[in-house]
Structures are given as structure tokens and as C-alpha cells.
């Protein structure tokens, strides 16, 4: 318990430091160990990455138990704090969200993402009053467990292009402000990519903001200047790895050569990485 409390406290501090918190998302123990070894101060899981790796589509098609089993293996393997992407909480009720928060803590993670997209209706968001109840349930469960779980509350207004584009920003601010008031430590609006809107959001909300970055996004130095607290890469890290495997396969089939294997870590390096687990 004391170790989890200390990790949660240190993870919380990373959201308010001078340096922007960088989270290249992981999907298994090997990817988590690689990110830790590369010097990152925390590890964030990708729900889509884990789902894809186990043969499921994204969108809560994987069970809570399957997702948390992977998260637990990751949390046990690394020394740094782990934050878990648990989609919409694997259930439609505040009680479901609370149970998922407990499972996240029991798995050894000290942070979690909670989104307002509905897996069975990808173009519909959870009604705001219900989403606020879910956030409060997570906060209450964390309090009962005496673990200062860092909650990153997400709206998919931009990612799913919900509603009238002219009203999207204002509705995003309304939702994220309410999430913050309900107990979220950090807020998240994936799909935002242009610097002026990101800067405006930081100024309007005045709280830690997570940006999902990728090709076309402002660079990390630019995001830092805008006041962004946290940058994650989502499932792109896992998908890029799949892209590497695709290039290996295509080269082998087309030319019978192996140049795409040149950057692979050695067998000894991989063994050493696995042996240094806590």
C-alpha cells in the first residue's frame, strides 16, 4: 500500500512540474520495459494496443478482466508509475466505474483514463450528468482505498467529431470543466491538433491537459510553450510496431532480404531487459 501511495503521489507531481510529462503508450511487458529503460518517468497503457495484441477490436470489446490482467503484468514489471487506459470503465453505471477503479488500483496502476465515448454507440457520448457520477465514483473508490489515483478524464467530442463544428469547442470546454470539478486531476480531448485551439483550451481550463500527439501535431517543445502538461501517443506506438513487422514481411516475401531487421535489439539485450524486472 505504501509503495502504491508513493508512486501515485510522484505521478501526480509529474503533472505540475516544469517539464512536460511524456507518455509513449505501451501494450505489454516488453514495450513497458523498453519505455522505462529509455528514461521515461512513467508508463501509460493503450487500451487499443492491448486489445489489438490480444486479437480484439478497440472499443470495450475486450473484457475488464482481460485488460486488467495485462495492466497488472506491466505494473509488476516496471519500477515507474503506471497509468491505465480503461476506456469508459467497462460498464454503463457509476458502480461499474468504481469497480474498475478498484481493479486498476489492485493491478498496481496509480492512474487511469476514463472516457465519455460509448463503445456500443461510437457516435454517441455518455450524458454529462451520468459521466460526472462515474468520475465521482472513481474518486470515491480511490479515497476508500487511500490511494491518490490520478484520474485523466477524456471527452471524445473532437475525436468522433460530435455535433456542430461551430459548437464543438464550447461543448468540449463545458464537459472538461465539469469533469475537473467532479474530481478529475487531468483532462483530455483527443483529436485536437492545432496549436491555437490547444493554447486556447489551456488558457480557458487552467488545469493539467493531456494532448494525444502524432504526425501533424505541434512538437513537444511547442506544446510545452502552450502550457500542455502531458503528451501521450495512444495506440500509434503499437500500430507503428505492427507497421515495422509488415515491412519485414513484405521485404522477405518480395526480395528475400532482411534489411528491416537491422535495428532489432539483440537476443542478449532482450534477455537483459527481462532480467532487470523488479
Q: What is the predicted function of each stretch?
A:
Residues 2-233, 240-242, 246-247, 251, ...:
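Alpha/beta enzyme core
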Residues 148, 255-264:
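Flexible, glycine/charged-enriched surface loops at secondary-structure junctions
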Residues 261-278:
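A short, charged, Gly/Pro-tolerant segment at domain boundaries
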